[in-house]
């Protein structure tokens, strides 16, 4: 839902933190943008940001690290054609704004007639997908350490083979304001938290690691004991399962991917290839293929920044556009790309609410929010039992992808060998090797158990990291290459 009152509340918070302490008002911002528009540029914007972040980690019952930081600044951008000029400063002042404006406007030739009047300000209505609370103050320091202590106790009580526990808690309060040369004014207040646990289990001299956690755009009090216990259970189970794991077999085979976090393969191998900048430049395997079949029937992929409280969700993107629910692939047919303002303009389409940047010191680019595949009609049990011989990858670690070719490599953190429809034993060291666009065409069964990840994803692109979400149902993909150690 897009509503006006919370939008105005967020603007008030942004003014209080980003303008008033520095003696600035919106007249000063309009003058800065007019300075840029005195030259011929297609777009210009100011991006103000205030970020407060805190982190705690506990190991062996001892607080190992505690961190706290405050960062603030402004990024000033001008765009002419496909060229971008950008300057940023941690000094928020009239002088630094004007200096930055005079620097970036040189990307365009001086306009005839001198200064240009910036259009009347219009407040961009935005969504209200999460509260504007400061999560750092949602628990006091003692309560934060006690939460981590309970997580450690839960893990040790779970199984005597658990010999080491590491727990971490991170929280961030991020306030942004975007002012554009077209008169648009937008703001967002973005809480973000994450609880993580890693355990090491030992049996007969063999050690294995298991990790789990979750988070989103809410307060730290979201992590009640039941939720913390679920993270602990998952981490311990992963470590204990891998204590009995055998070397993974190698070769070409059918693979079943579990629901939720395994959607990271979809995000990396397909999602990046659907970002507008790669497609405008023709460097993606999906370039120029809108309206064509790019996946098996039944495969529908969305990028949705409008899911309440999710890690990848945004009320407005970092260019001031409301987030959207974008259908990228529908029943196997390519429908569209993920767009920021510049690439949308150059491709003759509308922005999709995906202009994102790591901070005020970075330029925006098309980035994913929450990317997932919709569910089908098969039960997960039915999909696993369909395997004559193959791999069941329940969870993943890291992975890499080449955007141009679509080739990917992913390592499974928890996987099982299946024969005649029955899980035989856990395996370790399995890597999935394939081509993203090709793998999409090899999806043969789609589960009815679509699940989003627990809220732990961070995506890197061109040196910038942003929080994201991924998700999918249980899937069977035929003809994947598994690199193993057997």
Regions found by a protein language model. Name each.
Residues 1-486:
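N-terminal small-residue-enriched
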